[in-house]
């Protein structure tokens, strides 16, 4: 269509890994607020490099700053762009999945509190393998489908969302090993990061 630029199977190195993308940029409906559609696959990228290089990640996924390891991701995204070519977060919608063979997260207040309550310092540093998290972005929030982690002998099932307002709203189902406090604990709520 007139006013639309399309790209197909564009490949590049990005974020310490590789990326391939197809999509379009269009001013056909509104020259002041161009429409961006993007389907991307990212492989072997660095959490910290992505955080350092993308403002949208710093705003929507501040947890990346405290995350080590590499990830792969599939993303299907649509948004309007502002006059400065930034995403218009009110129109941003996406579906995707992020996968990591080895992820490390530390210095998260909620996990520090959980470690103190359960007297298990292993919970202060999350190290998980074979993580697969499906997510959607709507209304300024990234919502994740329930996913499982095993940390310090404790099984966690997490689901919830993080927002542009720097809040995190997650529910955690914690299964403790036999011999500790034992049993299952469910906790949740909204906190500022």
Regions found by a protein language model. Give the residues of each.
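Small-residue helix/turn framework positions
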Residues: 2-193
